[in-house]
């Protein structure tokens, strides 16, 4: 086969082991997954009711325009429907963005470490990837990113809060950054975890009307608890949306996914409960970190914490796994002595912290 040359040296995404697989390997009767930043509280009861009672005509293609969901989200953010695009998770939106803007003659700028799919998709398109190291505290080096932009740059990526560090860039700093980015360079503001930020930032979706080179990406996979439904979306100027729709598959979000997302966004009381629970979980880890001088906890603003224990990441990961908790080794994230842990229920956070104390 005459494969694209850009695929040489790349590998496919390798998901973590399933809970059942880990239990069988280690002889455990229970295991808690804290590796994929899923919502430990599940999803809204309104969503659960739809799941229990919904009848989907599986032989009929879904609404390719996601009309009802589009109206619901547009009303929620007070946007025009043409300022939205819906995709099979943010992963697909990232793929579409790289497809329309990157090729072997272009480059893209991003932080490192950050969400791995930016780099992966850029390399698939054969583009040059310019990675700007995070600052010592895990913050984006925005000045360094600006300096990396040249006439061949087509996309700049900002993950906010950043995955895997959890750092959050204030809105004023984002706007100051946007003011200095050339108007023909797209800035992707990936806000997959924005609903977890406490206190919530002011509404800023309409920034896309001021900055025509901005797209804000969000998802129903995290705080809304619909990871398996695969519904993500982008907010941008109508012309950006028009171009993306040219390459978007015609039936890319499922009928059931659209229905569940509509109910999910309606139940903001549940979202508030999730945010409060998550904030309390972060406080548990902050209190733990304060008790040990060698422990570094990166600023947590998502539904996960990145903790550097000064111990080889694989050792931490294996230790927690043997004791019933699946986490994410920092070795795969650019932090060789750290582990990323999804904020769980209070009792799970307490149990993990107790295990880490024993390890130290």
UniProtKB/Swiss-Prot annotation:
The lineage of its organism: Bacteria, Bacillati, Bacillota, Bacilli, Bacillales. One of its GO terms (molecular function) is histidinol-phosphate transaminase activity. This is Histidinol-phosphate aminotransferase. The keyword Transferase applies. Its cofactor is pyridoxal 5'-phosphate. The modification N6-(pyridoxal phosphate)lysine is found at residue 222. Homodimer. Pfam families: Aminotran_1_2. CDD domains: AAT_like. It catalyses: L-histidinol phosphate + 2-oxoglutarate = 3-(imidazol-4-yl)-2-oxopropyl phosphate + L-glutamate. It comes from the Bacteria. It comes from Listeria innocua serovar 6a (strain ATCC BAA-680 / CLIP 11262). It is an enzyme of class 2 (transferase).
């Amino acid at each position: 086969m005459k494969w694209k040359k850009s695929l040489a040296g790349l590998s496919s995404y390798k998901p973590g082991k399933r809970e059942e697989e880990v239990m069988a390997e280690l002889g455990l009767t229970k295991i808690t997954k804290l590796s994929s930043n899923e919502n430990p509280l599940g999803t809204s009861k309104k969503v659960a009711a739809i799941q229990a009672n919904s009848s989907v005509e599986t032989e009929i293609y879904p609404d390719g325009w996601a009309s009802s969901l589009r109206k619901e989200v547009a009303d929620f953010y007070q946007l025009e429907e043409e300022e939205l695009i819906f995709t099979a998770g943010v992963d697909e939106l990232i793929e579409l963005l790289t497809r329309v803007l990157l090729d072997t003659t272009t480059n893209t700028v991003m932080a490192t470490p950050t969400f791995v799919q930016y780099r992966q998709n850029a390399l698939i398109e054969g583009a040059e990837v310019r990675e700007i190291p995070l600052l010592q505290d895990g913050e984006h080096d925005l000045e360094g990113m600006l300096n990396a932009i040249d006439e061949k740059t087509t996309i700049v990526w900002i993950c906010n809060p950043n995955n895997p560090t959890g750092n959050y860039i204030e809105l004023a700093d984002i706007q100051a950054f946007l003011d200095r980015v050339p108007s023909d360079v797209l800035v992707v503001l990936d806000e997959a975890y924005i609903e977890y930020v406490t206190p919530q930032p002011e509404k800023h979706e309409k920034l896309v009307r001021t900055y025509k080179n901005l797209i804000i990406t969000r998802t129903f996979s995290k705080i809304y608890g619909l990871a398996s439904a695969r519904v993500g979306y982008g907010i941008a100027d109508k012309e950006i949306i028009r171009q993306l729709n040219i390459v978007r598959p015609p039936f890319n979000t499922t009928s059931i996914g659209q229905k569940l997302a509509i109910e999910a966004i309606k139940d903001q009381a549940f979202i508030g409960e999730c945010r409060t629970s998550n904030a309390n979980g972060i406080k548990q880890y902050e209190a733990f970190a304060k008790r040990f001088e060698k422990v570094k906890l990166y600023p947590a603003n998502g539904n996960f914490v990145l903790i550097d224990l000064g111990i080889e990441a694989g050792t931490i990961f294996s230790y927690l796994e043997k004791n019933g908790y699946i986490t994410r080794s920092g070795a795969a994230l650019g932090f060789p002595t750290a582990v990323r842990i999804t904020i769980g229920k209070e009792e799970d956070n307490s149990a993990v912290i107790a295990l880490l104390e024993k390890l130290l």
